[in-house]
């Protein structure tokens, strides 16, 4: 008998599953007999419990398991026979009004994958960012690298500001050592007192009022000031309250940046200390980073363009599944940050609804585009990307081995290659406008994405 598939909506379907009770009972009996061989009950040796007692104890559980298995098997058979592309998991409910003495009947309600209509790629518009790495970008990177290697000299030993002597006031960029005492309504509070506390003025590590109070002090001088803690301050006992502080400056140290010389080049991994080689390596790294960032921006542009020209309905079941994935990813992120009980954090799935819908929609569009145009990742493409990624590490061969030793990592690289194939394919047909941007603007754009 042909199965009747009812249309309940654009993607929602329903089909009735019928199971002969005698077939189900036969399977129940077989499982109970198998179970009886190992059942333990007080007063009986293992495997010697009467079958009737085993049935009384486990019949309900076994029946539920058999029905679940049989329903799933029958649904799979119907899906194949009717060429149904089921999206997500079906839900099953007994048809109470049609139960017969000889048959179990269940309604299976589910969604199917949609038809994906991708419009004319020639109408898609994409702005492609490009950037050029020159001496200015290399010099800015060297400045950053120097600041990362800053060291400090005690007052009187010289430094970036010049030798102002031991009685010169502290200024932004100086590293200061202080003692401080804080009170609220005349009473000291936890965390409000410290000795030999070290911080760098201008880094923003301390609250603004604290930094302002330390600025301009000389070694041995003190200053009193009021500090109002923000309402959202991490210390709940003092949040929103005003404290009276006394800060005493004990030591001031000048910042000193290393010279760009052979030793500096060696610290960056240039073994012979050659400055020309150092600049060439920095340029190569910046170009690699610029390529990665421009690819990311262009990929997002292409994905947005594909969504604009595509028509499809999105299965709710797939959106809900992806919402749960995003919730788990958020919990894992919290756990990595050291948040206690992160795995049980009450994160509402609804907050990811729009993101999940976009992800699912894009996945369906990309799958259709890849299938229709043969854009699957080739082994040599995957290897080329792995090799390129490995170049930025000290031991590229070890990184390559690391990738190929784990199928999940390799699958992630394969997915990246597929996306790259899609991007290249779309760029070859879309209206593309090239836009030159600075490396700083490029970095800012990808940081905000």
Swiss-Prot record:
Which Gene3D superfamilies did the record assign? 3.10.50.40, Trigger factor ribosome-binding domain, Trigger factor, C-terminal domain
Q: Name one GO cellular component term.
A: cytoplasm
Q: Which UniProt keywords apply?
A: Cell cycle, Cell division, Chaperone, Cytoplasm, Isomerase, Rotamase
Major location category of this protein: cytoplasm
| UniProt key word Disulfide bond | no
Per UniProt, what is one Pfam family of this protein?
FKBP_C
Q: What class of enzyme is it?
A: isomerase
Provide the protein's localization: Cytoplasm
What InterPro entries has UniProt attached to this entry? PPIase_dom_sf, PPIase_FKBP_dom, Trig_fac, Trigger_fac_C, Trigger_fac_C_sf, Trigger_fac_ribosome-bd_bac, Trigger_fac_ribosome-bd_sf, Trigger_fact/SurA_dom_sf
List GO molecular-function terms, semicolon-separated. peptidyl-prolyl cis-trans isomerase activity; protein folding chaperone; ribosome binding
Residue intervals of the PPIase FKBP-type domain: 173-258
Catalytic reaction annotation: [protein]-peptidylproline (omega=180) = [protein]-peptidylproline (omega=0)
GO BP annotations of the record are: 'de novo' cotranslational protein folding; cell division; chaperone-mediated protein folding; protein transport; protein unfolding
Give the EC number(s) under which this enzyme is classified: 5.2.1.8
Family of the protein in this entry: Belongs to the FKBP-type PPIase family. Tig subfamily.
Q: What is known of its domains?
A: Consists of 3 domains; the N-terminus binds the ribosome, the middle domain has PPIase activity, while the C-terminus has intrinsic chaperone activity on its own.
What does the record give as the function of this protein?
Answer: Involved in protein export. Acts as a chaperone by maintaining the newly synthesized protein in an open conformation. Functions as a peptidyl-prolyl cis-trans isomerase.
Q: Tell me the PANTHER family matching this sequence.
A: TRIGGER FACTOR CHAPERONE AND PEPTIDYL-PROLYL CIS/TRANS ISOMERASE (PTHR30560), TRIGGER FACTOR-LIKE PROTEIN TIG, CHLOROPLASTIC (PTHR30560:SF3)
Q: What is this protein called?
A: Trigger factor
Q: Which organism is it from?
A: Burkholderia pseudomallei (strain K96243)
- Gene this chain is encoded by: tig
């Amino acid at each position: 008998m042909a199965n009747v598939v009812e249309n309940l909506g654009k993607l929602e379907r329903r089909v009735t599953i019928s199971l002969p009770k005698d077939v189900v009972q036969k399977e129940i009996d077989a499982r109970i007999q198998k179970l009886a061989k190992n059942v333990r009950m007080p007063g009986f040796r293992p495997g010697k419990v009467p079958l009737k007692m085993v049935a009384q104890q486990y019949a309900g559980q076994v029946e539920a398991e058999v029905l679940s298995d049989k329903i799933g098997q029958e649904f799979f058979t119907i899906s194949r026979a009717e060429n149904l592309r089921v999206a997500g998991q079906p839900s099953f409910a007994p048809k109470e009004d049609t139960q017969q003495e000889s048959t179990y009947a269940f309604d299976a309600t589910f969604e199917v994958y949609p038809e994906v209509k991708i419009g004319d790629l020639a109408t898609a518009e994409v702005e492609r960012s490009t950037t050029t790495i020159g001496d200015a970008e290399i010099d800015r990177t060297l400045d950053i690298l120097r600041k990362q290697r800053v060291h400090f000299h005690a007052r009187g030993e010289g430094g970036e500001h010049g030798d102002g002597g031991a009685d010169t006031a502290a200024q932004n960029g100086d590293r200061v050592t202080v003692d401080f005492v804080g009170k609220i309504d005349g009473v000291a509070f936890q965390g409000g007192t410290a000795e030999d506390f070290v911080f760098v003025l201008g880094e923003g590590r301390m609250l603004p009022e604290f930094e302002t109070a330390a600025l301009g002090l000389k070694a041995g001088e003190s200053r009193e000031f009021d500090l109002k803690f923000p309402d959202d301050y991490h210390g709940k006992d003092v949040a929103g309250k005003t404290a009276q502080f006394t800060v005493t400056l004990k030591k001031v140290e000048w910042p000193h940046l290393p010279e760009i010389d052979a030793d500096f080049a060696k610290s960056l991994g240039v073994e012979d200390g050659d400055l020309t080689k150092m600049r060439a390596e920095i340029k190569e790294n910046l170009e690699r980073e610029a390529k990665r960032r421009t690819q990311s921006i262009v990929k997002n542009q292409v994905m947005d363009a594909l969504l604009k020209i595509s028509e499809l309905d999105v299965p709710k079941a797939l959106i809900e599944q992806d919402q749960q994935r995003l919730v788990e990813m958020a919990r894992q992120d919290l756990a990595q940050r050291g948040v206690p009980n992160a795995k049980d954090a009450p994160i509402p799935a609804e907050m990811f609804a729009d993101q999940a819908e976009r992800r699912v929609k894009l996945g369906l569009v990309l799958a259709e585009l890849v299938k229709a145009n043969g854009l699957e990742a080739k082994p040599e493409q995957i290897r080329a990307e792995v090799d390129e990624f490995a170049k930025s590490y000290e031991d590229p061969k070890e990184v390559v081995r690391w990738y190929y030793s784990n199928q999940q990592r390799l699958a992630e690289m394969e997915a990246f290659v597929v996306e790259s194939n899609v991007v290249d394919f779309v760029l070859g047909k879309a209206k593309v406008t090239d836009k030159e941007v600075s490396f700083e603007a490029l970095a800012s754009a990808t940081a905000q994405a």
